A protein has these predicted regions:
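Phosphate-handling active-site elements
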Residues: 105-107, 130-133
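N-terminal glycine-rich flavin-associated loop
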Residues: 111-130
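Amphipathic, small/basic residue-rich leader segments at the start of a protein or domain
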Residues: 1-112
Length: 133
């Protein structure tokens, strides 16, 4: 089997690597500290972190959002709840992109590619009603 990446997948992998290096890794320690302090103080660690929300917006702007979804996924719900995007990558092409995300514990969250959300989105996209999508 040929595991060569298509140029589009190689480009996405390289862009994800650069984003992780330039944007995510520099804030990891501070984010970990904030999360730890919230948990230790009994605070709600599920409250969206404004720094992470900012990085998510940047990732979306750069076309690095929901890379696991089929191409051209869109709609009212998708726009409202941030599930739009998608590149239609094969598993072979997505694997190195996911590997690049794996360099940071925050990256899957920033790129909206974290489990179990990815699987849930794929199931709803394929089998859900228009409202669920």
């Amino acid at each position: 089997m040929d595991f060569s990446l298509f140029p589009r997948a190689a480009d996405l992998r390289d862009r994800v690597r650069a984003f992780v290096t330039d944007e995510i890794e520099p804030i990891e320690a501070a984010a970990h500290t904030r999360i730890t302090r919230l948990r230790e103080s009994g605070g709600d660690s599920w409250t969206p972190d404004p720094v992470i929300k900012g990085l998510q917006a940047k990732a979306r702007e750069q076309g690095l959002w929901n890379l696991f979804l089929p191409a051209a996924h869109a709609g009212t719900y998708a726009a409202d709840f941030g599930t739009d995007g998608g590149e239609g990558l094969s598993n072979v092409d997505y694997a190195p992109v996911a590997e690049a995300m794996g360099r940071s514990f925050l990256a899957p969250l920033v790129f909206n590619s974290n489990a179990p959300d990815t699987g849930n989105m794929e199931v709803l996209l394929k089998y859900g009603t228009d409202e669920q999508r």
